[in-house]
Amino acid sequence: MTLTRHQIRERAFQMLFALNANPEADHDALYQRVLTDDPNQLVPVPDYLATLVNGVLAHQSELDAQIDQYLSTGWQLKRIAKTDLVILRMAFYEIEHVDDVPNRVAVNEALELAKNFSDDRSRRFINGVLAHTLDDETDTQA
């Protein structure tokens, strides 16, 4: 089974969301659950899926600190819907740690995930946070 990067991001979101709810879950079993409906079939884990999941988990504290910088006054990480937080972590990870993904692509993919797994209000919130990130990056490069 060959997955597009978009499909891999969807699977990564599903895995990270599940791990957020149950950090002790068996990673290998979760990989198989998001990759196939057949419990008897063992599917190889795409490299980019493992990169996203392991990268977000390894850098979670750093990613949360970065996200926290871009929240409006009065907002805290614990107030963010779990779906939105997972999407933001993935986007920040791709922006900061994945060189072959342009930042605008990471933002667009995050918005697509929000469209599929969250609601319109959350999509606008995610867009606002990520827009500030790109604005700051543009200011730094200028």
From Swiss-Prot:
Q: Which domain of life is it from?
A: Bacteria
> Which UniProt keywords are listed?
RNA-binding, Transcription, Transcription antitermination, Transcription regulation
Q: Name one GO molecular function term.
A: RNA binding
- Does the keyword Transcription regulation belong to this entry? yes
Read off the SUPFAM superfamilies from this record: NusB-like
What InterPro entries does the record tag this protein with?
NusB-like_sf, NusB_fam, NusB_RsmB_TIM44
Its GO CC terms are: cytosol
Record's NCBIfam families?
nusB, PRK00202.1-1
User: What the protein does?
Assistant: Involved in transcription antitermination. Required for transcription of ribosomal RNA (rRNA) genes. Binds specifically to the boxA antiterminator sequence of the ribosomal RNA (rrn) operons.
Its family remark reads: Belongs to the NusB family.
Q: What is this protein called?
A: Transcription antitermination protein NusB
Q: Which organism is it from?
A: Levilactobacillus brevis (strain ATCC 367 / BCRC 12310 / CIP 105137 / JCM 1170 / LMG 11437 / NCIMB 947 / NCTC 947) (Lactobacillus brevis)
Gene assigned in the entry? nusB
